[in-house]
Amino acid sequence: MWIDCKTIARSIEERTKERVEKLGFTPKLVSVACTDDPSALSYLKSQRKKAEKLGIAFEIMNVSPEEIVSTLKKLGSDESVNGVFVARPFPLGLDEKEILSSVPVEKDVEGVNPANLGLLLYDEEIFPPCTAEAAVRILERETNLSGKRVTVVGRSVTVGKPLALMLLKKGRDATVTVCHSRTVNLEEITKNSDIVVVAVGRAHFLKKNMVKEGAIVIDVGINYVDGKLQGDVDPSVEEIARVTPVPGGVGQVTTALLFEHVVRAAERQRK
């Protein structure tokens, strides 16, 4: 069974639009780009369309590798800008940690600054990473997480690690296992899980025999195979479990949350 993520994204967007109207001013998102990656550029185009739909001002700033850090710092003091997004991947040779640390904390709508990531250790979700939060929102709609055995396959800074912390948060109270490329007996672990979240970047990695019947599976994968977008979960898993589709799944909710964060940032800055 496929999980309906479109309805979740639409609900977030409707609430965001209502909050924009109550602000009394037009919030603004600036996306900083220092990449020629086709998928990154495509995402920036989709951001523009979504911003127009929600009544949010939007600007793309194309910068050189030498300018990216200083540009991000300047945006921090620009009162006309409420949210800052930085497109990835970065050109080879750039210090990713330095760049992400330069995203203004109070405008870090994608939740990539180490300062915002660190708050997750204290159960504070001011600007959590959008993809990790999308997985949580979907799961909370599908089930009560308390006591559920959740396996997160992947330990990235943007998905796996923050998601594990968010699922452990008091009030959600999931029992979380994080697996990775060196995990022994992965199939045994996923097969005994109520929920499996996969974010490894390998098309159709999670097979039907690795999932128990009735489980919930969140597919965070983005892989292009012969020009077609594929997830990390094999389509056959849908026969025995509830699965988020790719495309049209976690990605839609992620984008909706990005703009929810822009409005949240604007509301916090207005106070």
From Swiss-Prot:
CDD domains: NAD_bind_m-THF_DH_Cyclohyd (cd01080)
A Pfam family the protein falls into: THF_DHG_CYH
Gene Ontology terms, MF aspect: methenyltetrahydrofolate cyclohydrolase activity; methylenetetrahydrofolate dehydrogenase (NADP+) activity
Pathway the protein contributes to: One-carbon metabolism; tetrahydrofolate interconversion
Gene3D superfamilies: Leucine Dehydrogenase, chain A, domain 1 (3.40.50.10860), NAD(P)-binding Rossmann-like Domain (3.40.50.720)
This protein's UniProt keywords: Amino-acid biosynthesis, Histidine biosynthesis, Hydrolase, Methionine biosynthesis, Multifunctional enzyme, NADP, One-carbon metabolism, Oxidoreductase, Purine biosynthesis
InterPro entries: Aminoacid_DH-like_N_sf, NAD(P)-bd_dom_sf, THF_DH/CycHdrlase, THF_DH/CycHdrlase_cat_dom, THF_DH/CycHdrlase_NAD-bd_dom
GO biological process: L-histidine biosynthetic process; methionine biosynthetic process; purine nucleotide biosynthetic process; tetrahydrofolate interconversion
Described purpose of this protein according to its UniProt entry: Catalyzes the oxidation of 5,10-methylenetetrahydrofolate to 5,10-methenyltetrahydrofolate and then the hydrolysis of 5,10-methenyltetrahydrofolate to 10-formyltetrahydrofolate.
Subunit relationships: Homodimer.
Protein name stated in the entry: Bifunctional protein FolD
Source species of the chain: Thermotoga maritima (strain ATCC 43589 / DSM 3109 / JCM 10099 / NBRC 100826 / MSB8)
The gene coding this protein: folD
